[in-house]
């Protein structure tokens, strides 16, 4: 009996140990499987977004930063649930096309082109990857969408359409003696050409004349501004990425000549333009981020209406007004957001 116990007991212990080891091994494999599944799930959650910007300037930078911050505020932080690849074409159309082609070949989940030239380039490269444009002045007229309420295809976005009449009405309140107005723009930018056409309509209705100066790159802006200041009572800058990138030059030339410059974006007021009546580009970026989350969650871009900002503000550069001797009527001052050349004041 003792002999039997001596044989059976070790066998039982060995069997138990084997089962325990087997159980641990199985549990480890299960944990590895679970870890693998979790890792795979995490990978699936990373949504790749390519942001492309035609050129570096404050308006577009403001939109981009607000867009990224807006995504983060909704729980989509770069490097966590999403991965953002930001590229700047530095004003070069060839670079712009190459960037968009790279986004497409990399099979990004969403392309976010900032401004009309970027949107046109992206739309020309893919009909499948969702495109969410922002700061496109005339998306319908430029053929980006079929309908503002139901864009169709793989594209939608936000528009920074300006009301030229409201800007010019403000201009005539601040500087009522305008008879001739000059404008500088890149005729290759359809957004700028569209706004200038609206300016021409307004001027004709008001009995004003318009002097146009077209440029092809930012290095030509200074000469264009210098050629205008002796011929006009004011200058109007449309939504134009080429001119915007050289806005401080326009402001310097015009301020020295005591010529008011009316612009189409708040950032151009910050860069020395006298005034505008327009949208808040931070809000534009934030609204674009909200639409991006809809797309991330599976909504078809073509079913999301294009959003045009309706909440407009008066923006005035206090430093510029003082420099050129323009007094701001109190009723306008009460509604305005003021800029110095450095920062806005409420």
Could you describe each region identified by the protein language model?
Residues 49, 67, 156-203, 305-321:
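An alpha-beta-alpha
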Residues 83-105, 214-228:
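Structural motif
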Residues 294-346:
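Hinge/cleft segment of the Venus flytrap/periplasmic-binding protein
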């Amino acid at each position: 009996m003792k002999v039997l116990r001596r044989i059976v007991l070790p066998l039982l212990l060995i069997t138990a140990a084997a089962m325990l080891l087997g159980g641990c091994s199985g549990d480890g494999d299960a944990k590895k499987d679970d870890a693998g599944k979790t890792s795979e799930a995490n990978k699936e959650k990373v949504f790749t977004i390519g942001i492309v910007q035609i050129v570096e300037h404050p308006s577009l930078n403001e939109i981009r930063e607000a867009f990224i911050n807006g995504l983060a505020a909704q729980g989509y932080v770069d490097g966590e649930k999403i991965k953002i690849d930001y590229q700047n074409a530095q004003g070069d159309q060839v670079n712009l096309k190459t960037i968009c082609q790279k986004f497409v070949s990399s099979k990004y989940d969403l392309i976010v082109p900032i401004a009309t030239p970027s949107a046109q380039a992206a739309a020309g490269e893919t009909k499948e990857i969702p495109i969410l444009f922002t700061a496109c002045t005339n998306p319908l007229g430029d053929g980006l969408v079929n309908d503002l309420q139901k864009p169709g295809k793989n594209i939608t976005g936000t528009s920074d359409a300006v009301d030229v009449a409201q800007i010019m009405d403000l201009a005539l309140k601040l500087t009522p003696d305008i008879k001739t107005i000059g404008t500088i723009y890149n005729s290759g930018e359809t957004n700028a050409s569209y706004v200038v056409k609206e300016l021409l309509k307004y001027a004709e209705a008001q009995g004003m004349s318009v002097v146009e100066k077209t440029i092809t790159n930012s290095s030509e802006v200074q000469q264009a501004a210098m050629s205008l200041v002796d011929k006009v009572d004011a200058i109007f800058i449309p939504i134009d990425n080429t001119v915007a990138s050289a806005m401080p030059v326009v402001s310097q030339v015009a301020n020295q000549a005591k010529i008011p410059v009316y612009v189409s974006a708040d950032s151009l007021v910050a860069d020395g333009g006298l005034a505008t009546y327009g949208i808040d580009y931070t809000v534009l970026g934030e609204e674009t981020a909200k639409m991006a989350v809809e797309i991330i969650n599976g909504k078809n871009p073509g079913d999301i209406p294009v959003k045009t900002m309706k909440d407009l503000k008066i923006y005035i550069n206090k430093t510029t007004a003082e420099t050129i001797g323009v007094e701001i009527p109190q009723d306008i001052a009460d509604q305005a957001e003021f800029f110095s050349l450095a920062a806005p004041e409420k």
